[in-house]
Structures are given as C-alpha cells and as structure tokens.
Design a protein with these regions (language model features):
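Selective hydrophobic functional segments
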Residues: 44, 48-97, 185-220
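Selected transmembrane alpha-helices and immediately adjacent juxtamembrane segments
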Residues: 1-38, 125-174, 204
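Membrane-interface alpha-helices at helix entry/exit sites of multi-pass transporters
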Residues: 39-45, 70-71, 168-177
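Lipid-exposed faces of alpha-helical membrane segments in multi-pass integral membrane proteins
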Residues: 9, 13, 52, 81, ...
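Single conserved hydrophobic/aromatic residue that forms the stacking wall/gate
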Residues: 217, 221-231
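Alpha-helical transmembrane segments of integral membrane proteins
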Residues: 5, 44, 97-104, 134, ...
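Transmembrane helix exit motif
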Residues: 56-66, 104-128
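Loop-to-transmembrane alpha-helix entry segments
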Residues: 92-106, 118-124, 197, 201, ...
Length: 231
C-alpha cells in the first residue's frame, strides 16, 4: 500500500521537472522498475503521468493564450508516427537490454544537462515555416521514435532544438514542447495499453501527483522571465 503515496509524492516532483524542462522519466522509470514492474510495463505505466503532465501543461498555456499551432500540430504528428515505432521497439526488446540502454541514456542526459548551451534570450526571429518546417518535421519524427522508446530526458532535447534551431523564446518553447509530447505520448501509451503493459494503480498514483506538480508550475510559468540555463 505504501507504494501509492510514495508514487504520488514522486509525481509531484516530476510534474514540476517535466513542465520546466524534462527529464522526469529519469526518476520515475527506475523507481517503477525498483517497485517490481518489468521494464516494458514500467515504460507503459510511466506514460500515464506523462500524459497528465502534458495535458495539464497544455491547459495552462491555453488559458493564458499561448498557442504555437499549426507548427506544434505538424511536428507533433510526425513525432506521433515516430513514437509508434519507438514504443513497439521498446515492447519487443529484452528487459536486460532495455535496462542497460536506460543506464547509458541516464548518463548521456545528465551530461547534456551539465554541458548544454544556454537558451537564447529575448525576442527572436522564429524559423517555423518553409524549409525550417520540413527540417523540424524530420527531426521530430526521430525525436518521436526516441520518445516512444523511453522518453527519458526528451524535454531537454526538444527545448534545445526549438530554441536554437526554430528560434522560439522560452515560453513558446515550453508550450510547443507540451503540445508535441501530448500528441506523441497518446500514440505510445495506446501501443503499450494494447499490449497489456500498463499498471493503472501505479500509473494513476504517479499521474495525479504529476498533475498537481505540473499545475503548481504552469500557474506562474507565463509570467516568468524569458531565459533559462539548462547547464
């Protein structure tokens, strides 16, 4: 029984982390595996919290009129296609191999966080049409594959690409990130669900905590200064 309140508490922390930048799955996946779930079930269960985080973040940004469609829709759909492929790979892979890959990913993501370039500040000249849109759709297909496979640390990758390539400011980066993650996570979650790889008790406990943490952050997110240092 104690697993459930612990997961709610973990979810609160992860909700804030995911909405600010990402990387919450680096915490939740190992915890779910530690609690005894097979790696593929932990991966599928983790998607419930991700869905609730992305959904509540989207509602927060929408309530403040921060929208980045149709760009976020276009890249989100390409990410969705990629996520279906990535999720199926995660389902088919052996648990021991997945855990080794996850360990390597955790090290890489930590290094990215420590040594990533600083987010660009101020009013930027966005590049979200024409050739930039085509490149973005291709990149988000790859990002979606990774997100469908494991999702850990993907928020940092998305933030860096949207800011450094698409030249979005921090608030629009976070709004776009939340929309894209919501779109592709629906596909990944359904893939795990169809294969009966979701523990709803753990997932909902984590999800409700995540929802609270996410709302805690997004209530003030649109009023914060347009800068962040991912290092």
């Amino acid at each position: 029984f104690w697993h459930y309140p612990v997961l709610v508490l973990v979810g609160c922390i992860v909700g804030v982390i995911n909405t600010m930048a990402g990387g919450g799955s680096l915490i939740t996946l190992p915890i779910l595996i530690f609690l005894g779930l097979p790696s593929n079930v932990a991966n599928g269960t983790n998607r419930i919290g991700l869905l609730m985080t992305a959904f509540s973040a989207n509602m927060g940004y929408r309530s403040k009129g921060i929208l980045t469609s149709p760009f976020s829709t276009y890249v989100g759909l390409f990410a969705l296609i990629g996520s279906l492929i990535g999720a199926q790979i995660a389902i088919d892979i052996d648990d021991k191999i997945f855990n080794k890959i996850l360990s390597i990913i955790m090290i890489i993501v930590i290094l990215v966080i420590l040594f990533s370039p600083q987010i660009l500040k101020g009013d930027l000249n966005e590049r979200i049409k024409g050739k930039s849109l085509i490149v973005s759709c291709f990149v988000f297909f790859i990002i979606g594959m990774y997100g469908g496979f494991v999702n850990a640390g993907i928020g940092f990758i998305i933030m860096l690409f949207l800011n450094l390539y698409n030249r979005m400011n921090l608030i629009r980066v976070n709004a776009t990130k939340s929309a894209v993650i919501l779109i592709y996570t629906i596909g990944a979650f359904l893939t795990f669900l169809i294969n009966d790889l979701v523990n709803f008790g753990y997932g909902l406990s984590l999800g409700f905590g995540t929802l609270f943490g996410c709302l805690l952050y997004t209530s003030d997110a649109a009023d914060e200064e347009d800068s962040v240092d991912l290092g």
